[in-house]
From Swiss-Prot:
Function: Forms an efflux pump with AaeA. Could function as a metabolic relief valve, allowing to eliminate certain compounds when they accumulate to high levels in the cell.
Alphabetic keyword roster: Cell inner membrane, Cell membrane, Membrane, Transmembrane, Transmembrane helix, Transport
InterPro entries, per database record: PHBA_efflux_AaeB/fusaric-R, PHBA_efflux_pump_AaeB
GO molecular function, one term: transmembrane transporter activity
Organism: Shigella flexneri
GO BP: carboxylic acid transport
Subcellular localization, as worded in the UniProt entry: Cell inner membrane
UniProt-recorded name of the protein: p-hydroxybenzoic acid efflux pump subunit AaeB
Family: Belongs to the aromatic acid exporter ArAE (TC 2.A.85) family.
Membrane-spanning parts: 13-33, 38-58, 69-89, 93-113, 121-141, 152-172, 370-390, 407-427, 431-451, 459-479, 482-502
Length: 655
């Protein structure tokens, strides 16, 4: 496909984006808004943002959800801006500095919350800054400006949603159904690989791909949930399927690891059975029926616990999969599965990374303030706004540097494009609403195509062009003002990029160590006799951490294997029949405290000391298990865990 080619699948969204822009423009001028530009800009960003993220037309519900987050972020930012202005109106410089800190604080929060919800906090940060900067000439108009800004943004969001509904957004349901079938086949093929006990790298690639696909399916579930309330039953089933899919991965990998030391546990009966190739979900269904008969014939005692657990999870997966595809009423058997264990939320391992983002945003905003005050440039305020926008939105993404470059390219492209609209098109179309709408629809259409291709600078060009062309009421054409605005955007993006380069983010290794120690803590916390604690479902949270580890350290197989081993240890110890007595219970609490100290230790020396203490406590614990005559189902996984921690203690303690 050529650089300027237009694919058929890109046309519908391009028309949708053009419609959203035209609707916002028409409504803005019809209701005599002072700056319809904000409504048009909001409609464009809300519609184009999900398309840029998806690399194509977004699924149904994505635009509505993004609009909802934008409304929340705008209202939080407006309220924060009003509070700051009321409290510090007599000290303008302090007021702006507090706003810079507020923007940094919002970026810090957005780095810790779920990525899909972080948009609202990033927006809240720079909205307050926009209000404080804009009202500098006339502070008494602050409430009016805040109300107008909220109104214009709500109008833009409504227009984007109307355009989305008008062009019948595509549903993600069929993709979910296909992925459920394909994922089950892949799970069976992983178990075949693990029972064959072949090349470790092939197995690593297979389970790594399944972790990514299961995480992607969870993302699809979120999209389906946003799409319509009629998928509520499917959403409940998919949430349980996520845990079942992770359970299947865990049991398969444990089957592989067991054969490293005790290959005789997997009998020839099961090896021959899993030799049969499968291609479709129907093949898997037939094999599972046969496998259940084999287990009934051999007996539970003669079946390896990992295979028995795998078959049980695969059977439940199949049952819920049929319910998702048909979206029928949840029956009693399904309800029993869905009333599973409560999921545990873990503390973010990226706190240091979030603090780096706080300083990047705060320092870049303060730098913009100093630049504005030192130069006295009329568009210094515009540069400050762009600094806040770039840093607030870039920090929450995996590669902030590339986001800043995208904004720089976009603002550079917006200069000639905006010049064409400012000098030629808008002056010749302002007398006709129809011609004005057509001219902006053409802009939205072609940039909408480029946004779907994820062309570098396309998203920034769309927002920056709309921001600098004259869409005020009434329209005034001052070339110096246009040039100042365009140059202010470019300077702001360059300053933000400079701060991102100067304030290095060296938190990657620390985050990796914290993640690995959290896996250790989870494995240790599984050693408990507390019934409520044993029923807690840690699996989704553990695999979420594993997915983060895979993204932070792509290709680092030793780290992935260590993390997976800790997850397997957690699952095995969680189900182990640990003797119930006060002596062991007290020691469980002591080991959990020590594991927490390992995670929270701020220096390598303290971390090594606490980790050494944890290893000593594990030795004492194994002795206590022998005294209390614990069965092999308890002593063996504890011994394996202690051995793993001894082997990898340097990787788990050194920065």
């Amino acid at each position: 496909m050529g650089i300027f080619s237009i694919a058929n699948q890109h046309i519908r969204f391009a028309v949708k984006l053009a419609t959203a822009i035209v609707l916002a423009l028409f409504v803005g001028f019809h209701f005599q808004l002072e700056t319809p530009r904000w409504a048009v800009l909001t409609a464009a960003i809300v519609a184009a943002g999900p398309a840029f993220a998806a690399g194509g037309e977004p699924y149904s519900g994505a635009i509505r959800y993004r609009g909802f987050l934008r409304i929340i972020g705008t209202f939080i930012g407006c309220i924060a801006g009003l509070v700051i202005i009321i409290a510090m109106i007599r000290a303008p410089l302090l007021m702006i500095l507090v706003c810079c800190i507020w923007a940094g604080f919002c970026t810090w929060i957005s780095s810790l919350v779920r990525i899909e919800n972080s948009y609202a906090w990033g927006l809240a940060g720079y909205t307050a800054l926009i209000i404080v900067i804009t009202i500098q000439p006339e502070p008494l108009l602050t409430p009016q400006f805040a109300v107008e800004r909220c109104s214009e943004i709500v109008i833009g969001i409504v227009c984007a949603i109307m355009a989305d509904l008008l062009f019948s957004p595509r549903s993600i349901k069929q993709e979910v159904d296909r992925e459920l079938e394909s994922l089950l086949v892949a799970q069976y093929q992983l178990m075949q690989l693990c029972i064959k006990h072949g090349d470790g790298e092939v197995v690593d690639k297979a389970w790594g791909d399944l972790v990514r696909r299961t995480t992607a399916l969870q993302g699809m579930r979120s999209n389906l949930n946003m799409e319509s309330s009629r998928w509520a039953r499917a959403n409940r089933r998919l949430k349980a399927i996520n845990t079942l899919s992770l359970t299947l991965i865990t049991q398969s990998c444990e089957t592989y690891l067991i054969q490293n030391t005790r290959p005789e546990l997997i009998t020839d009966t099961f090896r021959e059975f899993f030799d049969t190739p499968v291609e479709t979900a129907q093949d898997v269904h037939k094999q599972l029926k046969r496998l259940r008969r084999v287990i009934a014939w051999t007996g539970e005692r003669e079946t390896p616990v990992t295979i028995y657990s795998w078959v049980a999870a695969a059977t439940r997966y199949q049952l819920l999969k049929r319910g998702v595809i048909s979206n029928t009423k949840i029956n009693a058997t399904e309800e029993e599965i869905l009333q599973g264990e409560p999921e545990v939320k873990v503390e973010s391992a990226e706190r240091h990374h979030a603090m780096v983002n706080f300083w990047r945003t705060t320092l870049s905003c303060i730098l913009g303030t100093l630049f504005w005050l030192w130069t006295g440039w009329t568009s210094g305020s515009g540069a400050m706004v762009m600094i806040a926008v770039v840093t607030s939105l870039a920090m929450r993404l995996p590669n902030p540097r590339m986001v800043a470059i995208d904004f720089i390219y976009g603002t550079l492209a917006a200069l000639p494009l905006g010049l064409l609209y400012f000098l030629v098109i808008i002056p010749n179309t302002q007398q006709s609403m129809l011609l004005l709408c057509i001219s902006l629809a053409v802009l939205g259409f072609f940039l909408g195509i480029e946004v779907q291709k994820r062309r570098l600078g396309s998203m920034g060009a769309l927002a920056s062009t709309i921001n600098i062309i004259v869409l005020d009421n009434p329209m005034t054409f001052h070339f110096s003002q246009f040039l100042d605005s365009a140059l202010g955007q470019i300077v702001g993006c360059v300053l933000a990029f400079t701060v991102i380069l100067l304030v290095r983010d060296k938190s990657r290794d620390r985050t990796g160590r914290v993640l690995l120690n959290q896996f250790v803590s989870a494995a240790v916390s599984a050693m408990t006799t507390n019934v409520a604690r044993r029923k807690e479902n840690h699996l989704p949270a553990l695999y979420q951490q594993l997915f983060l580890l895979m993204n932070k350290f792509p290709g680092d197989l030793p780290k992935f294997r260590l993390a997976l081993t800790m997850i397997i240890a957690h699952q095995r110890l969680r189900d182990a029949p640990i003797p119930v007595n006060e002596d062991l219970s007290a020691f469980h609490r002591q080991m959990r405290r020590t594991a927490d100290h390992v995670i929270s230790a701020r220096s390598d020396d303290k971390r090594r000391r606490y980790f050494g203490q944890l290893l000593e406590e594990l030795e004492i614990y194994q002795e206590k298990l022998r005294i209390w005559q614990a069965p092999p189902q308890v002593t063996e996984p504890v011994h394996r865990l202690a051995g793993m921690l001894h082997k990898y203690q340097h990787a788990l303690t050194d920065s």
